[in-house]
Every structure is written in C-alpha cells, then in structure tokens.
Regions:
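Structural motif
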Residues: 28-38
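Conserved small/polar residues in nucleotide/adenosyl-binding loops
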Residues: 2-11, 658-667
Length: 668
C-alpha cells in the first residue's frame, strides 16, 4: 500500500502532427476503486515549468476538455477531495488528444496539493475552490495575510490586527481540513502548506447559521515540524500582537501549539454622546455628554494545543484544547453631562468599567470515510466561561455626589455541544445528508448593586436536518429541511418555555458559462432570545435610565430570500446581490417611563424587515502586485414595534487599493 503523500505520475508521449493548429485535450476521470465517473475533479493545465494555462472541473460524466490549446509541452494536475493528486505530463502535444479514462486513487482526509504559478479559481454550485499562486504564497506571512492577497468577495481582512470579518455582517465560520478552527490557528498556518481555500458563500444546513465558511485545505507532512513567530508592536502607543506557533508531525500523528498575546494601553480615549427622550407626558429631555481624555487598558491572550491522528487513509481524529482570556482593568470615560435646554444644568460624569473573562474549551472531532462515498462526522465541544464585571457610574456637582452606581456581576456558564452528520454521495453530483446537533447550557449569575440577586438558567437547543443536492443540466439545486426544539427555564419561574419549529431551505444555482452564474436562495430559521435579555434583573445605567430583561420573551421565525449574479473574465470580477428579510414577532428593545426613570427592556414586537442590495467590482492583479476593489450598497430597515415604527436607510461604500511586494522584494 502507498502512504498518505503518494503522488501518481503518468507519462504520455505524443506523436508529432504535420499541421500547426489549435488543439483540444480531453479525458474522463474515474474512481480507481469502483470505476465510477468522478465529477467536480479540479483539472489544471500548466506548462512544464508550472505556469497556469487553464482550469476546469469534470462534469456529471467525469469528463473534461480544454479547447484552443497551443501546441507544446504541458502538465495536467488532477485534484479532488478524497483522492490523491495525480500529475500527467504531456510531451510534444501537436494534435487533438484524448487521454481516455484516468483513474484516481482514494486518499486520506487531508490531501497532498497542487502548486500553481498563476492564480486559479474554480466555481462550484456550493463553493469556490481558490488556489493561491506561487507569488501570493511567497509575499504572504500567514493564513490571514494570504486571504488579503486573494481578495475574496465580502471577506474583510484587517492586516494590522490579523482579523477576518464579513462585509454586511453575519457569522463567519473558519475550518482547517474540515475541522472548526479560529483566527489564531489561521495565523499559525504557513502559506506554503496551504493547498487551497474553499470559499462557501452558500453553506449547507450542516454549517448552521454561518453566512460564509472558509475551509483551509492544508498539507499534512509524514514527518518533520515547523516553528515560527509573528510579532507586531506599536511605536507611539502600547499596542502589541505577539504570536508564537509550532507544529510537529510523526507518521500518523500531529501535535500543534499556538499562543497569542495582545496588550493594549491607551490614554486620551473619550466619548461624546447625545440622547433625546420624548416622555409620555409630552415633555422632551435632551442630554449631551462632552467627553474628556481618559484611559483604556486591556490584555488578551489565546492558547491552542492540538493533537490529531490519521490512523488510516479514511479516518481523522483531532482534539483541540483552547484557552481564551481577556482582562480589562480600565475602560474609563469621564466628562461633563448637561441639559441642552439649560446649559447651566450640568454635572460631572465618571463611567468606569472593569471586567475580565476566561473561557477554556475542549473540541473533539472524528471523521470516517466509508465505502461507496459515504462519510460520518462526529463533533463534541465542552466549554466553561467565567466572567467578572465591575462598573462605577457617578454624577457629581461641586464635590457633592448626586448619583453613585456600583454594579458587580459574576457569571459562570457551562455548555456542551454534540453533533453527528452522515453524508452519501451519488453519481452525477447528487448527495444526501442527515445531521443531529444538540446544545445544552447552564448559567449562574450573581448581581451585586446594593441588592443581592442570583439567577440560574437552563437552556437547550436541538437541531435535526436533512438535505439533498442534485443537478439537472446547468441547474444545480439543494433542498433541505430541519426541525428545531428550543427549551429554557429560569430559576424562580415555575413555567418553562418550549417550542418546536420546522425550517425549510432551498437553493437554485444556474450556470450560464464558466464565467457567470445566477443563484436564488430562500430559507426559514428561528431565532432565540439571549440569556441576558431573558434575565429579569434590573441594572441601573445612570441617573435617568434602568435596564431590565424580560423572562417572557419567545423565540420567533425568520424568513429570508436572496438573489446573486456573478460574472468574471480574466482580471475582472463583478458580483451583484440583493436580499429581503422578514421577522414577525422579532425581539427588539423598547423604552418605558416609570416615575422619573426610563426603563429599557425587550419584547416581541410586531415585525422587523430589511431590504439590501450590494455591488462588488474588482480588478487585479495588475503588474503582478496591484489589486483594486469597490463595494457599494444600501440597507433599508423597517422596525414595527408594538408602540412605535422606525425606518432607516444606510448607504455605504468601500474602496480598496491593495499592493504587495514582489517575491524578489520580499526576499531582499
């Protein structure tokens, strides 16, 4: 038997033709185990010195074809999830060439990769396969920096803080070889180890509520190791980002370690604020806060310790211990608070917050590839979260204390998440998957603010789903349905809340050509109230306001539909997107007047709606070092409360000019 990193090479010699012409190269990819045609295989045509020429994916019959190829010497690179990568050398191609059946051998979960000199991207109905070029890997220092080079749609990268986000908001899920990861594990990746990034902008039900999924497919060497650091330090302020990481491989096992430390210490932070209260009796109060320089200080640290075992080519087990911590001894504001209608009515204000949290977790993941293209995945995550918060708010005049608020909150939360997924792939790209996920959490909170309050919350969320993926000619479709059960109970409340929901989801993806497609998606899902909103404890904000939770909040349904059109040609790329959200009985805040106080609370309101549109244009890379992108859009919000109605329109745009040094400059 061959090992994990085996690469199969095949030499094909061509008979020289007598006519110089544009030729075609074609073939059919089959599974070496069962002789079935294999679709969605990435077929990349390169010159013999690894310069990218063209790239396609195999169709339902496992076939591929390259048209209008110049005569010459080439190399084919065949890669697909679950198979060993195969290289085929084509010498002296001068006539139409049919390679016939090409057989791919099954591989382990983490595959060996493809080295491509020209940037390449292959579209699939549910994701994009993005292959970094050799230049992009050479000018990047880690997995986050490489993402900046790729400039994927909607992905926002902050190179200063090594942070990744989504334009327009939403949950971003990061994975490495299919296993959930976090930003610090991506920072620890060496660009040379990254084969490709799978960009899911239409994730299936197995990914939960994720808006976008980024899956880094990386190499797994048989033996050896690596160690590195990534250090950044501000010059004029105490701002630092210090990263240390290492990895050791020995046969079937891999050990990894990464540590991040981020101190912040700023002087001169201030806050300007303006509030207007229109009271039920017809009076209006308008207050303005004029901030003065103050102090902010925090200390972040993250630790990852991982172990993985690939006992066979079809199985993968990984265990990751994560420790997250944030200590914020100072987050202080101070200034003058005055009445707009009478500026002589003013007080001195101090608002100081000290908090910290520690969050250890253990993540266990197991994947087993079975015969006949079947996959089983099990994931278990246990987390403990401990938080402390101390807030002091004071208003004074001429050294006389008018308002003195001292809030202390101590919280403990225990959670356990279990997940099981089964997937069966059929011919012609069809696939069926089932999944079960349950989240159980227990929280205890202690409130000390002149009174002592203790709350206990028990919350559970169960999720069962089934999804089918199919294809009819150029139309790909995905149909899914899930059943959710939400339960919670708060101490002191004899009644518990329990609700069941059925949530359908449908996606239609029509491919016009290799360069453009149109996709429509519609889904129904449920949203649950947060633990903080459910707590009936009152917390005083200032001399005028009180915050109070609502234990009677109910979960609610969310309806969403969106339409996407994408076109790309060479260095030009465009993406046009529109969406509509409708959420009846949405949880939104409301304000009540009780005596001379304003109470901020939450309730299930009439509905919340949102209309969105976005256009993205991108050009690059130019001269192998310059990329330009423009993103512009609009969000129109409509909030219909039980006693109010609000509308708001937000226009936005984002222009980015990104340059990177050439590999030669980087090496110098």
């Amino acid at each position: 038997s061959r090992g994990l990193g085996d690469v199969y090479k095949r030499q094909v010699s061509m008979v020289q033709g007598v006519f110089a012409q544009k030729i075609e190269i074609k073939g059919t990819i089959r599974n070496a185990t069962d002789n079935e045609a294999t679709e969605f295989v990435n077929v990349v045509l390169q010159t013999t010195d690894s310069v990218f020429v063209n790239g396609v994916s195999t169709n339902n019959n496992g076939s591929f074809i390259f048209n209008k190829v110049e005569a010459g010497n080439y190399r084919l690179v065949l890669s697909c999830v679950g198979y060993n990568t195969q290289y085929i050398t084509l010498n002296g191609v001068k006539r139409n060439t049919d390679l016939g059946d090409i057989f791919l051998e099954d591989a382990s979960v983490a595959l060996e990769g493809v080295i491509i000199n020209g940037s390449n991207q292959i579209n699939r109905p549910d994701r994009k396969l993005v292959f970094p070029s050799e230049r992009q890997m050479k000018v990047s220092t880690n997995g986050v920096n490489l993402l900046q080079e790729l400039m994927l749609p909607r992905i926002q990268v902050n190179p200063m803080n090594n942070e990744i986000g989504i334009s327009g908001g939403g949950e971003l899920q990061i994975r490495i070889n299919g296993v959930k990861a976090d930003i610090n594990e991506i920072k620890a990746l060496r660009p040379a180890d990254i084969i490709r990034i799978e960009y899911h902008d239409n994730p299936g039900l197995r990914y939960g509520n994720a808006e976008i999924v980024l899956d880094y497919i990386v190499r797994r060497p048989d033996t050896g190791g690596s160690f590195g650091t990534d250090l950044s330090q501000g010059i004029n302020a105490m701002w630092g980002s210090y990263n240390v990481f290492g990895k050791v491989n020995h046969k079937k096992t891999e050990f990894g370690l990464s540590y991040h430390m981020g101190p912040r210490d700023f002087y001169g932070m201030y806050r300007d604020n303006e509030e207007t209260f229109r009271l039920a009796d017809g009076n209006t109060t308008q207050r303005v806060e004029k901030g003065e320089p103050s102090h902010a200080m925090l200390f972040m640290q993250n630790l990852n310790v991982s172990y993985s075992l690939q006992a066979s080519k079809n199985s993968l087990f990984s265990a990751t211990f994560r420790l997250r911590g944030n200590n914020q001894p100072n987050w202080d504001y101070q200034g003058v608070l005055y009445n707009v209608n009478d500026e002589t009515d003013m007080v001195n204000m101090i608002d100081r917050t000290k908090n910290s949290w520690t969050r250890p977790s253990l993540d266990l993941y197991y994947q087993q590839n079975l015969k006949k293209k079947q996959t089983l995945v099990f994931n278990l995550v246990g987390t403990y979260n401990r938080e402390k918060s101390h807030r002091i708010y004071q208003e004074s005049l001429h050294n006389e204390m008018l308002t003195d608020i001292n809030n202390n909150v101590l919280g403990d939360k225990y959670s356990l998440i279990g997940e099981a997924i089964y997937e069966k792939q059929f011919s012609k790209g069809n696939a069926l998957s089932f999944g079960l996920k349950h989240t159980q959490s227990y929280s205890n909170n202690e409130y000390r603010n002149g009174h002592n309050y203790d709350t206990r919350m028990n919350q559970g969320n169960s999720y069962i789903f089934s999804e089918y993926r199919g294809k009819i000619n150029k139309l790909d479709y995905r149909l899914g349905i899930s059943l959710t059960r939400f339960y919670y109970n708060q101490s002191g409340n004899d009644d518990s809340s329990k609700k069941y929901n059925v949530n359908p989801k449908a996606t239609l993806h029509y491919t016009f050509s290799e360069n453009s497609y149109l996709r429509w998606k519609a889904e129904v899902f449920n949203a649950t109230p947060s633990l903080s909103n459910l707590s009936a404890i009152e917390q005083t904000i200032d001399s005028f306001q009180i915050r109070r939770g609502n234990p009677n909040l109910k979960s609610y349904m969310c309806y969403r539909t969106e339409l996407t059109y994408e076109w790309k040609k060479g260095i030009f790329y465009s993406n046009l997107w529109g969406a509509y959200d409708y959420r009846p009985n949405a949880i939104m805040d409301e304000k009540l007047q009780e005596d001379n106080k304003i109470v901020q609370t939450w309730d299930n309101q009439k509905d919340w709606q949102k209309l969105s549109g976005r256009l993205m244009l991108r050009v690059g890379p130019l001269w192998d070092m310059l990329q330009l992108s423009f993103t512009g859009g609009v969000n129109h919000y409509m909030s219909h409360g039980n006693n109010y109605s609000h509308t708001y329109t937000n226009w936005y745009y984002d222009c980015l000019l990104y340059t990177s040094p050439s590999p030669r400059d980087r090496q110098k």
